[in-house]
Amino acid sequence: MSHLLRKPQADEISQGVNIIHDVTSANSDLKYVGFKVVDLTPGSAYTEDLKKTECCIVAVTGKITVTDYDQTFESIGTRESVFERKPTDSVYVSNDRSFEITAVSGARVALCYSPSEHQLPTKLIKAEDNGVEHRGKLANKRTVHNILPDSDPSANSLLVVEVYTDSGNWSSYPPHKHDQDNLPAESFLEETYYHETDPPQGFVFQRVYTDDRSIDETMTAENENVVIVPAGYHPVGVPDGYTSYYLNVMAGPTRKWKFHNDPAHEWILER
């Protein structure tokens, strides 16, 4: 199995709290992005001290209460399945703070991390504040929920977005990359993809490759898998009969999403 592909685990760290994914700089090639998925049973709680790290807490499914011990956001979260295709609530918590998540119902929570030195205010990102976009045409159509875009100054480094891609379509396509710290032409952003499929026995194909092919991995990502993108192009293809959801986390030295298309495939945009 590729070192860029992670399968879900169920590591129970306390009663009712299971770590499904935990991607860190210590166990991956990433320096700027960390990613964790936590499942909670009703009434259970997860706590964390952030130190020099910022975090976006995404209520993937279910309802949760989040506190940083100064502010409390009660019973947030909007859906029982990501395939309800409606935006959800999130909470941004800055470095050198602590937080607690308590499950109001059974819940799945994504924790999106990046190193941070400059403390910013804790912020509730309401579902209705997610910018919704419909991108692409032909077999290259997807729907985007912008949770923390680069136009929102709420974070120091993090960018967080949800993407839905319908049956038979491609996403992150034509292949693009953002692995050069060369603004204004291109920014350096690492990335993770947390995948779900509907129906859940489905899968998507994701290729991660660089111009020199020093990275060239084509993976079958099944439901609840994570794909790690330290560099390179990273398109996703969705087979007929299935719908794809993924949650992206990006971060790098500059909080700007400026990508570069693979010149070999850029002609696709001209149709």
Swiss-Prot record:
It holds the Pfam family KduI. GO terms for biological process: inositol catabolic process. Keywords: Isomerase. It comes from the Bacteria. Pathway: Polyol metabolism; myo-inositol degradation into acetyl-CoA; acetyl-CoA from myo-inositol: step 4/7. GO terms for molecular function: 5-deoxy-D-glucuronate isomerase activity; glucuronate isomerase activity. It catalyses: 5-deoxy-D-glucuronate = 5-dehydro-2-deoxy-D-gluconate. Its EC number is 5.3.1.30. PANTHER family: 5-DEOXY-GLUCURONATE ISOMERASE. Involved in the isomerization of 5-deoxy-glucuronate (5DG) to 5-dehydro-2-deoxy-D-gluconate (DKG or 2-deoxy-5-keto-D-gluconate). Belongs to the isomerase IolB family. This is 5-deoxy-glucuronate isomerase.
